[in-house]
Design a protein with these regions (language model features):
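Alpha-helical transmembrane segments and their immediate juxtamembrane cytosolic regions
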Residues: 2-268
Length: 268
C-alpha cells in the first residue's frame, strides 16, 4: 500500500504514515493492466488504451507521494536509499540467481560457460533495456526499476539545481530523452529515465494543487477524457520499454499519465 510521511511529529508520538486509498487503488489497477496489456496483440484498441497510461501512471503516482530533498546531504542519502531498495535486489536476482540457474540448467558445466553466462547477464544489466535493439539485449522486467532509480535521481537533482523552473526544465529533459531514445538507446535506460522525469513532476504538481483539483474533480476528468479517448482511438500511445514515443505527440503521453491516474482519483 502507498503511504506518505507526515511532516509533523511530537516527542510523545512519532510521525505516522497515512494511507492514500485512491493511489493504492490506482497502483493495484495498473499492476493488473500490466499483465493484461502484455497478452494483447499490437494494434489492439484495448492494448492501446492500456499502454496509453499504465506505465507512466506508476511514475506519476511516485511523483505524487515523493518528497524531494532540499539539501545535498539529503540528496546523497536518498540516492543511497533508492539504490539499496531498487538496484541491489535486481543485481542479486538477475546477476546471481539467473546466472547460477542458467548455468546449472545447461549441459555445459565448464567455467568458460559460467563466465559467458555471467558476462551476458552483466551486459543486459549495463543497458537495462526493456526491449532488444541493434545488438542491445533485453533485461526484461528490471528495466522499470532502473528507469525509476535514474529518473528519481535526475528529478531530485533538477529540484536542487532549478527550484523555480521545475516544470519547464522537466519538459525539456523529457523531450531530449524521447529524442535520444529514437536515435540510440542509452546505458542504464537513461533515455527513458529522462522521460520519466516529466511524469514525476506532473505527480508532484498534482499533489501541490490538490485543493483546487478537489473542487473541479469531475470537470477535470471529463476534460482529460476527451483527448485521451481520441488518442487511444487513433493508436497514439506510449510504450516506454520499446521507446515508442513520438516527438510530435510527446506532450500527450504526459497527459495520459495524469488522465489515467486522475480518472481513478475522480471516481474514488
Amino acid at each position: 500500500m502507498t503511504a506518505v510521511q507526515q511532516p509533523a511529529a511530537t516527542a510523545s508520538r512519532p510521525a505516522v504514515r497515512q494511507r492514500i486509498d485512491w493511489i493504492d487503488t490506482a497502483k493495484g489497477l495498473c499492476m493488473i493492466l500490466v499483465i493484461v496489456g502484455h497478452t494483447l496483440p499490437y494494434g489492439n484498441l484495448m492494448r492501446n488504451f492500456i499502454f496509453s497510461f499504465h506505465m507512466p501512471a506508476f511514475f506519476f503516482l511516485t511523483g505524487y507521494t515523493a518528497r524531494r530533498p532540499d539539501t545535498w546531504q539529503g540528496f546523497a542519502r536518498r540516492v543511497r536509499k533508492d539504490f539499496v531498495a531498487l538496484i541491489v535486489p535486481v543485481l542479486g536476482v538477475v546477476q546471481v540467481f539467473n546466472v547460477l540457474l542458467n548455468f546449472f540448467l545447461s549441459d555445459d558445466r565448464s567455467l568458460t560457460n559460467l563466465w559467458d553466462i555471467a558476462r551476458y547477464n552483466a551486459i543486459t544489466l549495463f543497458w537495462a533495456s526493456g526491449n532488444p535493439a541493434d545488438g542491445i539485449p533485453s533485461c526484461g522486467m528490471p528495466w522499470f526499476l532502473f528507469a525509476l532509480f535514474w529518473g528519481k535521481l535526475i528529478w531530485e537533482l533538477l529540484g536542487l539545481l532549478f527550484p523555480k523552473g521545475d516544470f519547464a526544465v522537466s519538459f525539456i529533459v523529457m523531450l531530449f530523452g524521447a529524442y535520444i531514445g529514437q536515435v540510440q538507446y542509452l546505458p542504464q535506460c537513461l533515455d527513458v529515465a529522462m522521460v520519466v522525469v516529466m511524469y514525476l513532476t506532473l505527480g508532484q504538481l498534482f499533489r501541490q494543487h490538490q485543493a483546487l483539483l478537489d473542487r473541479y474533480r469531475v470537470p477535470l476528468f471529463l476534460a482529460m477524457l476527451i483527448p485521451w479517448a481520441w488518442c487511444c482511438q487513433q493508436g497514439i500511445y506510449i510504450e516506454l520499454a520499446s521507446r515508442h514515443t513520438s516527438i510530435t505527440f510527446c506532450a500527450l503521453p504526459s497527459v495520459y499519465a495524469a488522465s489515467g491516474s486522475s480518472a481513478i482519483y475522480a471516481v474514488n
